[in-house]
Amino acid sequence: MFEYLYGTVEYKKMDYIAIDINGVGYRVYFPLREYEKIEVGNKYKLYIYNHIKEDTYKLIGFLDERDRKIFELLLKINGIGSSLALAVLSNFSYNKIIEIISKNDYTTLRQVPKLGEKKAQIIILDLKGKLKNLTYTEEETVSMDMLEDLVLALEGLGYNKKEIDKTLEKIDLNKFSSLEDAIKGILKNMRIGD
């Protein structure tokens, strides 16, 4: 069993990456939400869930250990398999899931493909008690919301996704008090980088 893998991403497909560790390539499936964050040639530490079922063995990786914890909790719910649990984490971050559960927000949770009303209710009811010990970080939620708005604003100004992602990796969004301040700070940083 693997706790985590640390290595270089050799290539990536839509639902998995090949990570090289000392000349051995591991196929690791991951939430689609993290696709843009993972770049070929970079090193990453992936927290691994070892999915073993009858004749199948899959490594499922997460950039954040808290995402793996939520994934494991989802798998313990009757009727939720690895594909559906991965779909939930492909649509929502750790903090967003905590928020959805705490607010009983079935409507938002049902945005996950193939997740009907009944399963959404079961997930919320089942996780409500289990998530008491998991923390919700307000700062990170603000940053995620701001991040989405920033990307849209910068794309509107003509910057491409690769330029934007490269710049955002270097910046702590929590230091900005508003979206306007963040845009100014990022544009200044992008001009310096030119």
Swiss-Prot record:
InterPro entries: DNA_helicase_Holl-junc_RuvA_I (IPR013849), NA-bd_OB-fold (IPR012340), RuvA (IPR000085), RuvA_2-like (IPR010994), RuvA_C (IPR011114), RuvA_C_sf (IPR036267)
Region entry Flexible linker, spans: 143-147
Region named Domain III: 147-194
Entry-linked Pfam families: HHH_5, RuvA_C, RuvA_N
Region Domain II, annotated ranges: 64-142
Chain intervals for the UniProt region annotation (Domain I): 1-63
One annotated GO molecular function: four-way junction DNA binding
Biological process annotations from GO: DNA recombination; DNA repair; SOS response
Keywords: Cytoplasm, DNA damage, DNA recombination, DNA repair, DNA-binding
GO CC entries: cytoplasm; Holliday junction helicase complex; Holliday junction resolvase complex
Localization of this protein: Cytoplasm
DNA damage found in the keyword field: yes
Record text about domains: Has three domains with a flexible linker between the domains II and III and assumes an 'L' shape. Domain III is highly mobile and contacts RuvB.
Family: Belongs to the RuvA family.
Function statement: The RuvA-RuvB-RuvC complex processes Holliday junction (HJ) DNA during genetic recombination and DNA repair, while the RuvA-RuvB complex plays an important role in the rescue of blocked DNA replication forks via replication fork reversal (RFR). RuvA specifically binds to HJ cruciform DNA, conferring on it an open structure. The RuvB hexamer acts as an ATP-dependent pump, pulling dsDNA into and through the RuvAB complex. HJ branch migration allows RuvC to scan DNA until it finds its consensus sequence, where it cleaves and resolves the cruciform DNA.
Assembly description: Homotetramer. Forms an RuvA(8)-RuvB(12)-Holliday junction (HJ) complex. HJ DNA is sandwiched between 2 RuvA tetramers; dsDNA enters through RuvA and exits via RuvB. An RuvB hexamer assembles on each DNA strand where it exits the tetramer. Each RuvB hexamer is contacted by two RuvA subunits (via domain III) on 2 adjacent RuvB subunits; this complex drives branch migration. In the full resolvosome a probable DNA-RuvA(4)-RuvB(12)-RuvC(2) complex forms which resolves the HJ.
Name of the featured protein: Holliday junction branch migration complex subunit RuvA
Classification of source organism: Bacteria, Fusobacteriati, Fusobacteriota, Fusobacteriia, Fusobacteriales
